């Protein structure tokens, strides 16, 4: 694993009205089968694992991610771009406000295994 900090962080604006400022703090390079854990100041965790074919961007959506008090959601913006977001359990109202401000369409919560099976698997494939 190699981390190259961006000092000072590069800042850029984004969002539906360019009203969100993001700070790019650096670049991390992972080799296949290396993992990093991202943590919030309140203890939420997210594991990202590098494989030789790409990345596991999240732990299992309907098991381990939930145990970290995070919930995956698929959203679509006004330009038609899709994003997978991870919402902290205790920050649902902040997420709802953000989604409304950014005109995000909630497509599907990704943490309900039964719901995902109903949505994506044909009868008899379960």
PLM features: residue spans?
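Intrinsically disordered, low-structural-confidence terminal and linker regions
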Residues: 1-27
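Acidic, low-complexity, intrinsically disordered interaction modules
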Residues: 25-105
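Feature targets compositionally biased, intrinsically disordered low-complexity regions
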Residues: 14, 25, 42, 71, ...
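A generic structural signal for solvent-exposed, polar alpha-helical segments
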Residues: 9, 18, 59-62, 88, ...
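Short, mixed-charge low-complexity intrinsically disordered segments
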Residues: 52-57, 100-126
């Amino acid at each position: 694993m190699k981390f190259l900090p961006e000092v000072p962080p590069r800042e850029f604006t984004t969002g539906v009205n360019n009203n969100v400022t993001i700070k790019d703090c650096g670049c991390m390079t992972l080799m296949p089968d290396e993992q990093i854990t991202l943590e919030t100041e309140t203890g939420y965790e997210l594991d990202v694992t590098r494989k030789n074919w790409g990345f596991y961007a999240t732990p299992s959506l309907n098991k381990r991610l939930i145990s970290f008090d995070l919930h995956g959601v698929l959203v679509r913006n006004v330009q038609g771009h899709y994003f997978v977001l991870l919402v902290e359990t205790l920050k649902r109202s902040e997420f709802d406000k953000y989604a409304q401000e950014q005109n995000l369409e909630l497509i599907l919560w990704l943490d309900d295994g039964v719901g995902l099976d109903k949505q994506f698997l044909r009868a008899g494939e379960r």
